[in-house]
C-alpha cells in the first residue's frame, strides 16, 4: 500500500477547502499563495509559517485572514506580535509553534519548509491524516522509509509537489504499478552541461548560479549545476513510488519541458510536459483529483521548436552516481549524502573549496561513514535528525583536507 495515490479515484472537492502553508514566505510558498490568491472563494487559510521574514509572513496572514501564524525563529516572537497587533490572528514562535501550525485542522497542507527543520512539521500534518503536498526533500531523502510508513499508517495522502515527481505522479495514473518497468526523471543539465571536467572543477560561484531555465534559490541552483539535485530527486522517487534504483533513469533534457516519463510493460512511454514554472505542479496538487485553472504560461511547442535528450555523464557529474550508491547502501546513507552536500555547498559559497570539490566531500563523507560502521535503520524522526547532525559534523571535519587537496 502506498501513501501516494496512483489513481484519481477520490470524489471531486465541493465547497471551501481549508489550507495550511508551511514555508509560506519561501519560493514554493510564494507560488502556492499566488494560486490561492487567484481563487479566494475556494480556499480558507488555516495556518501559515515562515522562517524569519516576519513582515512578509504578517502581510500574508492579514491578506488571507489566516487563523494561526508561526515564525520558526523564536527570537522574532515580539516582532510578530507587533506586526499582528489589532488582528485576531493567533500566533507563535519556535519549532513547537511551527509543529502546532502543521497539526491544525486543514484539509490540505503544503509542506515547503526547507531543510531538516521541515521533517517534524510534515510528520505532524501526516499523523492527523491530512493531504500533504510534499515539497520538502529532507522528508524523503533523510527519512524516506519511516516517513512513508507513517503516512500509510495515518491514512495521509502524499502528493508530490516537486516538478519531476509530480510529472511521474501524473504519468503513473495512465497505468497500474505492477505494469511499470521504469521511470525517467529529466534534468536540464545546468549551466555546465557542455563544459569539460577541468572547466567544471574551476567553475566560479557566479557561473554556478546562472541556471539556463529555472529561477530558484542559491542552494538549489548550485545543486542543479553539480547535478546533486537530480541525485536527491532519484532518492525521493525511490521512496515516493517504492522503486528500486534500477527502475529509475535520468535523462538530460536542456529545454526543461518534459519533466518526467513512465515506461510501462507494453513499452508505451507516458510523459508530462509543461513550462518550467513551479505553479504547474503546485496547481495539480492543489486541485487534485480535479484540475484547476492555472497561472503559468501555456506551452507553445511550435515556438520551442525542438526537444532534445542525452544521457547524463557520471564522470563529469559524480554527484548523480553517488546518489545511486547511497540509495543502494540504505540505512541512513541517503541522509549522509544530503548532509554532506549541504556542508559542501556552504563551503563553496564561502569560497573555501572549488566547485569540483563538492562531490569529493560528499563521497569522502559517505565512505568514512560506512567504514565507521554507522549505517543503521532509521526508526524515528529523531534518528534521522541525529544522523543528519552527525554527518554534517563528519563532513565539516573532512572539509579542511578536501580544501587542501584542491589548493
UniProtKB/Swiss-Prot annotation:
Keywords: Isoprene biosynthesis, Manganese, Metal-binding, NADP, Oxidoreductase. Belongs to the DXR family. NCBIfam families: Dxr. GO terms for molecular function: 1-deoxy-D-xylulose-5-phosphate reductoisomerase activity; manganese ion binding; NADPH binding. SUPFAM superfamilies: 1-deoxy-D-xylulose-5-phosphate reductoisomerase, C-terminal domain, Glyceraldehyde-3-phosphate dehydrogenase-like, C-terminal domain, NAD(P)-binding Rossmann-fold domains. Gene3D superfamilies: 1.10.1740.10, NAD(P)-binding Rossmann-like Domain. Its cofactor is Mg(2+); Mn(2+). NADPH binds at residues 25-28, 53, 136, 138, 217. It catalyses: 2-C-methyl-D-erythritol 4-phosphate + NADP(+) = 1-deoxy-D-xylulose 5-phosphate + NADPH + H(+). Its EC number is 1.1.1.267. This is 1-deoxy-D-xylulose 5-phosphate reductoisomerase. Mn(2+) binds at residues 162, 164, 233. Pathway: Isoprenoid biosynthesis; isopentenyl diphosphate biosynthesis via DXP pathway; isopentenyl diphosphate from 1-deoxy-D-xylulose 5-phosphate: step 1/6. It holds the Pfam family DXPR_C. InterPro entries: DXP_reductoisomerase (IPR003821), DXP_reductoisomerase_C (IPR013644), DXP_reductoisomerase_N (IPR013512), DXPR_C (IPR026877), DXPR_C_sf (IPR036169), NAD(P)-bd_dom_sf (IPR036291). The gene is dxr. The keyword Transmembrane helix does not apply.
Amino acid at each position: 500500500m502506498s501513501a501516494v495515490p496512483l489513481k484519481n479515484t477520490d470524489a471531486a472537492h465541493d465547497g471551501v477547502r481549508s489550507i495550511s502553508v508551511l514555508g509560506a514566505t519561501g519560493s514554493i510558498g510564494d507560488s502556492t499563495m499566488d494560486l490561492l490568491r487567484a481563487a479566494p472563494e475556494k480556499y480558507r487559510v488555516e495556518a501559515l509559517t515562515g522562517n524569519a521574514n516576519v513582515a512578509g509572513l504578517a502581510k500574508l496572514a492579514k491578506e488571507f485572514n489566516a487563523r494561526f501564524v508561526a515564525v520558526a525563529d523564536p527570537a522574532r516572537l515580539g516582532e510578530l506580535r507587533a506586526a499582528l497587533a489589532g488582528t485576531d490572528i493567533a500566533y507563535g514562535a519556535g519549532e513547537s509553534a511551527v509543529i502546532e501550525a502543521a497539526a491544525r485542522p486543514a484539509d490540505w497542507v503544503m509542506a515547503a519548509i526547507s531543510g531538516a527543520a521541515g521533517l517534524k512539521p510534515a510528520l505532524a500534518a501526516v499523523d492527523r491524516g491530512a493531504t500533504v503536498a510534499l515539497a520538502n526533500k529532507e522528508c524523503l531523502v533523510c527519512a524516506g522509509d519511516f516517513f512513508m510508513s507513517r503516512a500509510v499508517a495515518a491514512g495521509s495522502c502524499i502528493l508530490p509537489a516537486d516538478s519531476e515527481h509530480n510529472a511521474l505522479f501524473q504519468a503513473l495514473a495512465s497505468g497500474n504499478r505492477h505494469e511499470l518497468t521504469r521511470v525517467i526523471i529529466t534534468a536540464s543539465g545546468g549551466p555546465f552541461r557542455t563544459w569539460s571536467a577541468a572547466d567544471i572543477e574551476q567553475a566560479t560561484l557566479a557561473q554556478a548560479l546562472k541556471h539556463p531555465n529555472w529561477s530558484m534559490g542559491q542552494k538549489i541552483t548550485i545543486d542543479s549545476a553539480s547535478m546533486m539535485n537530480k541525485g536527491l530527486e532519484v532518492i525521493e522517487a525511490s521512496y515516493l513510488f517504492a522503486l528500486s534504483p534500477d527502475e529509475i533513469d535520468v535523462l538530460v533534457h536542456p529545454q526543461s519541458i518534459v519533466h518526467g516519463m513512465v515506461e510501462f510493460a507494453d513499452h508505451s512511454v507516458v510523459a508530462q510536459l509543461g513550462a518550467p514554472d513551479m505553479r504547474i505542479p503546485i496547481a495539480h496538487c492543489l486541485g487534485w483529483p480535479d484540475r484547476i485553472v492555472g497561472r503559468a504560461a501555456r506551452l507553445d511547442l511550435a515556438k520551442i521548436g525542438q526537444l532534445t535528450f542525452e544521457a547524463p555523464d557520471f564522470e563529469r557529474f559524480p554527484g548523480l552516481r553517488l546518489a545511486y550508491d547511497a540509495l543502494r547502501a540504505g540505512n541512513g546513507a541517503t541522509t549522509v549524502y544530503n548532509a554532506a552536500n549541504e556542508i559542501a555547498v556552504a563551503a563553496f559559497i564561502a569560497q573555501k573549496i572549488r566547485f569540483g570539490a563538492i562531490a569529493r566531500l560528499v563521497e569522502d563523507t559517505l565512505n568514512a561513514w560506512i567504514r565507521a560502521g554507522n549505517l543503521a535503520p532509521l526508526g524515528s524522526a529523531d534518528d534521522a535528525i541525529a544522523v543528519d547532525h552527525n554527518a554534517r559534523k563528519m563532513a565539516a571535519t573532512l572539509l579542511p583536507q578536501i580544501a587542501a587537496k584542491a589548493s
